[in-house]
């Protein structure tokens, strides 16, 4: 049911997205000193249609990692999909899938499946004795690997609701980072730059807190966030 329970999010200039719950969020109340709050929700943001498309894989059983499939190495993507559908001497794999899951041909979910080239009769899985989940992973890796002319994008969105002097308030804060190319990706920037900046500040004794630290103390996160703004990594409210 996880991927059926999504909420939509629109970010000006960047389009419409959807978010679904990402594991247990309650443990973060203690980490951030928010023990008394009534609601805390952490989600994953994806393009609209992702959750419905992923839920198709779940319904078919393609995410199962508990058993292996013989001759998986030589199977085509099309053969893999057909494993999870009823036999029909006349209907195509595409028609069987649409009929079984009640997907219209002009549905955005159908477009996403076509983008994966998941009905290809020539592309091979190439993984020996793989589980369904491993076979699906191979298909996704082949399709989702960033090409030279492609760029990635990372979005983080915070929504804070609070009450002050009997009046309810809400603050929304968004971070949008876009990659430059296949090498200088948004992922590389947002993962690598904070670590690099923190390392330099420790070496220069600008951060002196000893031991392994979570970046939740102001001495650690404040100077790093400030310097990240020079690289275009900043939140807007």
PLM regions and their residue ranges:
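C-terminal catalytic/substrate-binding lobe primarily of soluble NAD(P)-dependent oxidoreductases
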Residues: 1-237
């Amino acid at each position: 049911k996880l991927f059926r329970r999504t909420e939509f999010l629109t970010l000006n200039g960047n389009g419409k997205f959807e978010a679904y719950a990402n594991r247990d969020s309650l443990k973060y109340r203690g980490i951030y000193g928010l023990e008394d709050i009534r609601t805390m929700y952490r989600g994953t943001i994806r393009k609209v249609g992702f959750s419905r498309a992923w839920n198709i894989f779940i319904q078919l059983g393609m995410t199962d990692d508990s058993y292996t499939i013989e001759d998986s190495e030589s199977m085509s993507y099309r053969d893999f999909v057909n494993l999870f559908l009823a036999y029909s001497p006349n209907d195509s794999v595409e028609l069987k899938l649409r009929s079984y899951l009640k997907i219209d041909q002009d549905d955005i979910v159908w477009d996403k499946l076509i983008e994966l080239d998941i009905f290809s009769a020539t592309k091979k899985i190439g993984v020996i004795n793989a589980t369904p989940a491993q076979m699906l992973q191979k298909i996704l890796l082949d399709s989702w690997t960033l090409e030279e002319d492609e760029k990635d994008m990372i979005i983080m969105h915070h929504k804070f609701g609070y009450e002050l002097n009997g009046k309810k308030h809400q603050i929304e804060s968004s971070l949008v980072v876009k990659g430059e190319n296949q090498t200088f990706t948004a992922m590389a920037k947002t993962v690598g730059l904070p670590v690099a900046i923190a390392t330099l500040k420790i070496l220069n004794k600008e951060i002196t807190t000893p031991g392994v630290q979570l970046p939740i103390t102001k001495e650690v996160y404040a100077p790093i966030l400030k310097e990240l703004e020079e690289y275009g990594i900043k939140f807007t409210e």
